[in-house]
Amino acid sequence: IKMVPASGAASRMFKDLFEFENSDATEPNNAYIEKFFVERENFAFYEALNRVCIAEEGKSIQELVDEKRYKDIVRLLLHKEGLNYGSLPKGLLQFHKYPQYVRTAFVEHLVEGALYTNNRNNEVKIHFTVSPEHIEFFKQHLMSELPRYEDLFKVRYHVTFSIQKPSTDTLAVGLDGVPFRNED
């Protein structure tokens, strides 16, 4: 059985983008933000973000960049009116880009399981530990992707989930470096 801890928040990956969004800056203000916009087409989520920009703002990412509307792009990447990547676990992000498709980290575990952990009956057993607020997203993603990968690899997946215990959560700190805890 392949065991996968999949509750890790992606918010840390976007720390600089959150800081930029909350700053007074109107244009990229550090090397990371500049690189994000210069290299934007290389991100696996680029096409999905571009579709959201067109749907929500009526303009492509390129048009928004041309108009210096950087924060609109960041907002649509990070928040629920767009891709909501600032609130999702890393496993649900479009993370790996291939010539014809993209995969989430979650799907990469399905692929790895098929390649390395299938048994003599071509069954693949994978267990994911997830956060309670994301379990339904993982289950929906699994159901949308499972047929494709069972067919591709000629395997049968047996995927289970459990909830990560709050006692194992990572300590959260604010922008000032001081630990904090929400009431919930």
Feature-to-residue mapping (PLM):
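Domain-scale recognition of functional cores that engage charged ligands
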Residues: 1-184
